[in-house]
Amino acid sequence: MSASCGPLGTSLTQEILSSLGLADKTAAWGTLGTLRTFLSFSVDKDVQRLLKAIAGQGVDYDTIVDVLTNRSREQRQLISRAFQERTKQDLLKSLQAALSGNLEKIVVALLQPAAQFDAQELRTALKTSGSAEDVALEILATRAAPGLQACLAVYKHDFQVEAEEDIRTETNGILQDLLLALSKGDRESYSGIIDYNLEEQDVRALQQAGESSTAGQWVLLLTQRSPEHLIRVFDQYRRCTGQELEDAIRNCFHGDAQLALISLASMLRNTALYFANKLHQALQETEPNFQVLTRVLISRSESDLLSIRAEFKKKFGKSLYSSLQDVVRGDCRSALLALCRAEDI
């Protein structure tokens, strides 16, 4: 099948219109996250509030949630260090002793450095049968380069083994190829300049790879090209072939290989929509999947959770906040709602 299908570049008007999606626009407060640096931050006051919350007759869950879900991760780390200095106690261990269940897990995730949290999630995914193609791909494909490097460094330190070695041991086939390529952190950064020649070249390469059902080219492009470039390639692939890239993957691959390639393509095509789907799926299970809810809401709270909320409401006709309210019960409910932050009208 030929890749010759008319001009690759859309018109200037189309380029401008395609950039106006609400889910891609930075909020008025300068971030697409729901959680930002707390401007009236006082580490001493927060330490005292947390100490009082766990030192009385009963645990003050509301205060713990209020403090930890209204401070940035950097501020939470400052609170942890200050708590240790002033009380000679470890804040994380103190809160673990006072809490239990899903709220305890959420608080632990909130107090861990991002790299440590990701490293533990990655390790669990690789060591748990059936989840590697999901969580491991998510972590390796959606973290910015500095965060990915930090995660892999912590992984080696905490588990005394390179993540790459665990990937080789615990996975196989195309999934292994994808994870190994992503773990190298070689994805190109977007220069802001559209390379139409490279776009055409990549469309041709994917068409040829689809005709021969070989995985090498798919792995190479999906793990090395920038997401911004790949989105254009995906769109042009559809215009040239009459089918979405994901449909081509379904026709060429089966089983774990198909799942892994489609998952990665979905993350790259629209990261916010991918996470909206993950959250919706977690809420639709017989019991809410708190591991997924916790990982996504915390890891995206300072980057793009507003975008995820917008995609969730657009696709499912109901806000993420209302969905959490309707499904989640128990002490952890207020923490998850606080991370989500607000209703979407």
Curated annotation (Swiss-Prot):
Q: Where are the Annexin repeats?
A: 41-112, 113-184, 197-266, 270-341
Sorted alphabetically, the Gene Ontology BP terms of this entry are: cell-cell adhesion
Q: Which domain of life is it from?
A: Eukaryota
Q: State the PANTHER family in the record.
A: ANNEXIN (PTHR10502), ANNEXIN A9 (PTHR10502:SF122)
Function, in words: May act as a low affinity receptor for acetylcholine.
Q: Which family does it belong to?
A: Belongs to the annexin family.
Question: Under what name is this protein listed?
Answer: Annexin A9
